[in-house]
Amino acid sequence: MAPRPGRETVGGQSTVAEPPPWERAHRPRPTWGLVEGDAIAPGRTVLRRIGGGKRFEVFLVWDEHRLAVLVAKVLRPDHAEDPAAMRDLVREGGLLERIAHPVVVRGFGVAADGPFPHLVLEHLEGPTLQALLDRHGPIGLEQLLPLGMHTASALHYLAREGVVHLDVKPDNLVMGAPPRLIDFSVSRALASAARLRKPVGTDAYMAPEQCDRSRGALGPAADVFGLGATLYRALTGERAFPRPEGARSSADLAVRFPQLSREPAPLPRRTPAAVAELVTAMLAREPGDRPTAAQVVAALEPVVAELPRRFVLGRRGWRPQR
């Protein structure tokens, strides 16, 4: 097989030269440089680049087989031949093939054999909850509580299917009717999650048992904690467990993860008592002290039923009625 672009071939092996640490810190991430019209697979062409992360570039693509606009999550050049990255891509695709729920993004399989290994996903319109918070600050109960109820229903379904998401956060919730839970890149089947030895997820939204793997096996309660931290952020505009600047790199777990030893600040007084009690319970340190996702749905249903349906669809997307 010919080496992929951007790589050197030494002794028949495709390699990437490692720059010194001071260069790696500021070096742009490797990119395929794909532009509109480039094919990443037969019948699948790039429309535009829409994002990316450490290991992936994300493109909007046109799929001739489905006659639809989809999303392709493409491994970056420096990870395209990395067995661990490929394994994670295939795992994510396999999990999504098992899942069919109206609040979960749909997956359409993995193309692992071509020059641009990628996962194909449903294209979702609308901003993420994080984008909404960045634009408007804390959102109203009319938006927040249906979001919480729908997301909890998805988490209940995942638990029934033996899957834990492990990265529930505002960036991974696309607003809409219903909202959609995205990004299963760190998700695991329950048996696989129980074998994890290192923290997995996004620090501010990780349950204590995710932060400190000595606390026991990971299960659906970790996702309930993540949703609780997300609802707290949406209600207040602040993290449930703020930490000092620079704590991210601390070797002391208690410094890096304040949720291991601290309680969240009380929610604003304007928060209905039933909602405040529920969110606080979802953030309990011990998994057994948290409600299940099904109990979260049951607690929110009567509150949501009494809310007025006041949404404004502006040119910039969903925003709270002020």
Positions of PLM-derived features:
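AlphaC helix of the eukaryotic protein kinase fold
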Residues: 76-98
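Activation-segment/catalytic-loop signature of the eukaryotic protein kinase fold
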Residues: 110
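Conserved catalytic-loop aspartate of Hanks-type protein kinases
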Residues: 223
